[in-house]
Amino acid sequence: MAIDSKPHDDLQLFKTNLHPCGYWPDRWASDLVMDPNDPRLGAIYPQTLAWGFRRSGNLLYRPHCEHCNACVPVRVNVNAFVPNRSQRRCLARNATLVTRIVPAERNAEQLSLYRRYLHQRHPDGGMDGHGAIEFDQFLIGPWGYGRFMEIREPATNGTPGQLLAVAVTDLTHQALSAVYTFYEPNAAARGLGTLAILHQIHWAQREQRPYLYLGYWIKDHFKMDYKRRFQKLEIYDGYRWRPFSTTYPTTHTL
């Protein structure tokens, strides 16, 4: 992985101990983590997205596994994006829903949806016991970039409609980053995860941000392969961003 760190030559990266892979049950993983005590993290966070890093709470990390390079950083070139037929159907199916951007501040309604989502969609995944403290630690960043994009049923008699999804999104001066999305598990047929990304792309276009970072694409993984459907997609090969291809190798060069 190449990092253009000339303005930050003293950046410190730490490699974590091995831990069970969150994607493949028979593999072990490790990550590179930027020094969480570095006071510059908030300022350089937008640039770290272009280096393939992700945010989890106040930690900036990227996978760095000795014998596996399956996690490939991807981003959508929003100005070149064209929705496919399935995505157009998703937009039409959900045309009556209401989307709004709110501050990244937890409320009881959001927390209830988050806990329901984890309990039904990720049981025994290590997160299904999350409460208010874990919600804040995981989703709300300390640097002021975070926003919550809420997707709701239409209002009735002035009362907001049911909260169906929350897309935690970081808005930087260079791009948007899709941090985490959770939604009503009983409304999965609506394709709310896809809808959230489509609205994030529109949001980036509206804010004149050229990219939406989607985290890591994992080829043929049932939870992560969907990201390739949002074209024009770009991948980070460890040195530079390239047009998406399922055949590009990745590296972990420092």
Curated annotation (Swiss-Prot):
Functions in the N-end rule pathway of protein degradation where it conjugates Leu from its aminoacyl-tRNA to the N-termini of proteins containing an N-terminal aspartate or glutamate. GO terms for biological process: ubiquitin-dependent protein catabolic process via the N-end rule pathway. Belongs to the R-transferase family. Bpt subfamily. It holds the Pfam family ATE_N. This is Aspartate/glutamate leucyltransferase. Keywords: Acyltransferase, Cytoplasm, Transferase. One of its GO terms (cellular component) is cytoplasm. The gene is bpt. The keyword Cytoplasm applies. It is found in: Cytoplasm. The keyword Acyltransferase applies. Its EC number is 2.3.2.29. One of its GO terms (molecular function) is arginyl-tRNA--protein transferase activity. Its main location: cytoplasm. It catalyses: N-terminal L-glutamyl-[protein] + L-leucyl-tRNA(Leu) = N-terminal L-leucyl-L-glutamyl-[protein] + tRNA(Leu) + H(+); N-terminal L-aspartyl-[protein] + L-leucyl-tRNA(Leu) = N-terminal L-leucyl-L-aspartyl-[protein] + tRNA(Leu) + H(+).
